[in-house]
């Protein structure tokens, strides 16, 4: 594999053969650098560099090139013969599978000929499955090699794009790597731990929900039919839960089903509630397609509406309400827009007898070469009472909970070329190393720990737990409680919603002006929509569970997320939102795309008020 393709794959980017031949000559001539190309692809919000992206990039640097004849004719040499490259029509059909403007039926099929049956659309998105393994994306990016001779082959990624791939040669690991068996920290004998009785309850955990498999026409039905029905059940569940929340708002009145709009007389003002199938901005306003369990309708919200700015930020597949008038032309003209949102006023909770604190963290990434082990060990020493001031001594003596929100290890095979970024290349040893470190957390502190996308767990969310056969050392820690992603922990009567935070990716992709650099704002948008990852078919793989377990059914006192490696906080309508940063220093890829993590920052939360009272800074050891 040449350095051009190898460099792209190492940084998580794929390239089609036609794009390769467009770009490689200019790259070899030094007309652009790999960093420039990756930044350009990132600005287009894609990790696949096809001929369209390549042409745009070449124009931006003032260069163009003709395709070689064999590419024009649709063939690519692999060294093992020629293989046919799918034509544009085939690729368009394949890439339509990842469209976010999907339509999910939640009831009867609309009678209008213009509205395609929703299950047909889902079948197009998911594909026909004759049996065996599911074709639903699991988040794995590693392609299957089509031969076993170690040669270059053309393979296809999960989106159907062909790219040149050479199996990564992994040298036998000869040198020893750290598993931290020698890290032993005794509690400071001078620390006087305040006797506080623990009071916690796992209020919600994915594993506790009993899910019934969806009913299909016959027991011998195809796997694809079952998955389609599971997703349809998921969206019905979402609509039902969020419809109930919306109807608790006194302003959301006179609600009717979309199918009954045709019976509304004259200019009578009514409210509809449904899933957002699509959203389009025009010079005069926004046009939505909204669907409920009975039908679909086009909704127009004018630009001068007081809710226009809020409506502009709504994600595909979110559940919303519109108030307005139905036109006989089949368009609903809205004058108000409502999100499920958080109530303005909530009942105040009684004070606690004793001050008690919780520590929030995430994204430890044990196993990565960039894991800040010195900083993390300093943090463990701090928990054991080796502090720098009387104020810190008072706080640490009252800490009873440590909450870790996913990506506790760096994992294996998460992205192309990851092996070269690992100091611990074995997934079992990564969890053993983490357990050795966490065994130094004082026994009076309860650790809650859940999975993220780098962990050995189901890739699609919600994630019930770690795969125990890989993460067994964590399950053996006596003061540790394994939780799901998401989970709700009730601490002394206060509800803490813990999620890894992958939904932030979709918010940043769809909402102008929001970035990973300030994750508190995307977290607020998710809270307003009362959902942790609303968009189906976006960047976040969602499991085909018959019930939507990502709906925020009850308003928590605090929301903790991680994933983006940047510390940030926000308070929205009385809810504290915290992104708990990372223990991984900036990687080479992050440098190229200008992602600046904030490792070693640790928020301390007063459980009574559910507010961050202090942020510890261990970054100087990173």
Curated annotation (Swiss-Prot):
It comes from the Archaea. Transmembrane segments: none annotated. It comes from Pyrococcus horikoshii (strain ATCC 700860 / DSM 12428 / JCM 9974 / NBRC 100139 / OT-3). Residues 96-109 have a biased composition (Polar residues). One of its GO terms (molecular function) is single-stranded DNA 3'-5' DNA exonuclease activity. The keyword Cell inner membrane does not apply. Coiled coil: none annotated. Residues 85-95 have a biased composition (Basic and acidic residues). GO terms for cellular component: DNA polymerase complex. It catalyses: DNA(n) + a 2'-deoxyribonucleoside 5'-triphosphate = DNA(n+1) + diphosphate; Exonucleolytic cleavage in the 3'- to 5'-direction to yield nucleoside 5'-phosphates. CDD domains: MPP_DNA_pol_II_small_archeal_C, PolII_SU_OBF. The gene is polB. Keywords: DNA replication, DNA-binding, DNA-directed DNA polymerase, Exonuclease, Hydrolase, Multifunctional enzyme, Nuclease, Nucleotidyltransferase, Transferase. The keyword Transferase applies. GO terms for biological process: DNA catabolic process; DNA strand elongation involved in DNA replication. Residues 76-113 are annotated as: Disordered. Possesses two activities: a DNA synthesis (polymerase) and an exonucleolytic activity that degrades single-stranded DNA in the 3' to 5' direction. Has a template-primer preference which is characteristic of a replicative DNA polymerase. Heterodimer of a large subunit and a small subunit. This is DNA polymerase II small subunit. HAMAP family: DNApol_II_A_arch. Belongs to the DNA polymerase delta/II small subunit family.
């Amino acid at each position: 594999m040449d350095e051009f393709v190898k460099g792209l794959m190492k940084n998580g980017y794929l390239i089609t053969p036609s794009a390769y031949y467009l770009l490689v000559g200019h790259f070899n001539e030094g007309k652009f650098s790999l960093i420039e190309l990756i930044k350009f692809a990132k600005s287009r919000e894609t990790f696949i560099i096809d001929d369209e992206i390549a042409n745009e990039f070449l124009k931006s640097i003032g260069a163009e090139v003709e395709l070689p004849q064999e590419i024009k004719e649709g063939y690519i040499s692999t060294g093992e013969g020629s293989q046919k490259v799918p034509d544009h029509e085939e690729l368009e059909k394949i890439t339509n599978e990842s469209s976010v403007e999907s339509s999910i039926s939640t009831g009867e099929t609309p009678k209008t000929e213009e509205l395609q049956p929703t299950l047909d659309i889902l079948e197009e998105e998911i594909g026909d499955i004759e049996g065996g393994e599911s074709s639903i994306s699991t988040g794995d990016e590693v392609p299957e090699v089509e031969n076993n001779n170690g040669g270059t082959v053309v393979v296809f990624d999960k989106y159907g794009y062909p790219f040149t791939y050479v199996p990564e040669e992994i040298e036998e690991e000869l040198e020893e790597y750290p598993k931290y068996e020698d890290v032993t920290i005794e509690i400071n004998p001078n620390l006087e731990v305040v006797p506080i009785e623990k009071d916690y309850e796992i209020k919600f955990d994915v594993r506790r929900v009993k899910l019934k498999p969806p009913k299909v026409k016959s027991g011998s039905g195809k796997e694809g039919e079952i998955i389609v029905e599971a997703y349809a059940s998921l969206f019905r569940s979402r609509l039902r839960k969020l419809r109930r929340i919306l109807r608790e708002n006194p302003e959301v009145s006179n609600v009717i089903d979309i199918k009954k709009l045709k019976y509304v007389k004259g200019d009578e003002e009514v409210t509809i509630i449904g899933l957002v199938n699509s959203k389009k901005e025009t010079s005069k306003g926004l046009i939505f397609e909204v669907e409920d369990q009975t039908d679909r309708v086009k909704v127009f919200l004018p630009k001068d509406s007081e809710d226009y700015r809020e409506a502009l930020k709504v994600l595909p597949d979110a559940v919303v309400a519109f108030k307005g008038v139905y036109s006989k032309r089949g368009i609903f003209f809205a004058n108000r827009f409502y999100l499920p949102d958080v109530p303005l006023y909530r009942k105040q909770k009684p004070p606690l007898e004793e001050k008690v604190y919780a520590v929030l963290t995430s994204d430890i990434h044990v196993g990565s070469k960039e894991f800040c082990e010195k900083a993390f060990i300093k943090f463990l020493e701090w928990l054991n009472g080796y502090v720098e001031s009387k104020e810190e001594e008072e706080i640490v003596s009252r800490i009873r909970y440590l909450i870790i929100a996913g990506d506790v290890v760096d994992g294996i095979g998460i992205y192309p070329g990851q092996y070269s970024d690992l100091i611990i290349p074995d997934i079992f040893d990564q969890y053993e190393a983490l357990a050795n470190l966490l065994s130094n957390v004082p026994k009076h502190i309860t650790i809650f720990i859940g999975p993220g996308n780098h962990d050995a767990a189901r890739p699609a969310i919600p994630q019930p737990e770690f795969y125990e056969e890989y993460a067994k050392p964590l399950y053996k820690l006596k003061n540790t409680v394994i939780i799901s992603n998401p989970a709700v922990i009730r601490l002394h009567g206060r509800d803490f919603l813990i999620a890894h935070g992958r939904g932030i990716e979709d918010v940043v992709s769809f909402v102008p002006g929001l970035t990973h650099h300030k994750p508190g704002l995307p977290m607020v948008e998710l809270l307003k929509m009362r959902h942790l990852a609303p968009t189906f078919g976006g960047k976040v793989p969602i499991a085909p569970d018959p019930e939507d377990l990502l709906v925020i059914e009850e308003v928590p006192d605090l929301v903790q997320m991680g994933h983006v490696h940047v510390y940030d906080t926000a308070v929205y309508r009385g809810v504290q939102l915290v992104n708990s940063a990372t223990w991984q220093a900036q990687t080479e890829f992050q440098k190229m795309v200008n992602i600046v993590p904030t490792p070693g920052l640790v928020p301390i939360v007063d459980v009574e008020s559910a507010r961050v009272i202090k942020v510890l800074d261990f970054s100087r050891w990173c």
